[in-house]
Amino acid sequence: MIYQVQIKVMPLKDLLDPQGKAVLDGLHNLGLSGIQDVRVGKNINLQIEAVDEAAAVAIATEASKQLLANAVMEYFEVVVL
């Protein structure tokens, strides 16, 4: 069976997010001062062939650990769509 899986990768909460800071500054320059914080990450969509949903999640998790997310600076979440 084919599963659509999304991997959400975000900077660790305790680390500075320079992209988020740049976006926040830009938003404030546009007069959108009510926005308090911005964190910039990435969404990666995979199409995975697997025997069941648990196997698809395991494959996506392994791909995230090995390549798609940097464990030193980022965390990830796997979501089956």
Where is each model-derived feature located?
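Long, contiguous binding/interaction regions
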Residues: 2-81
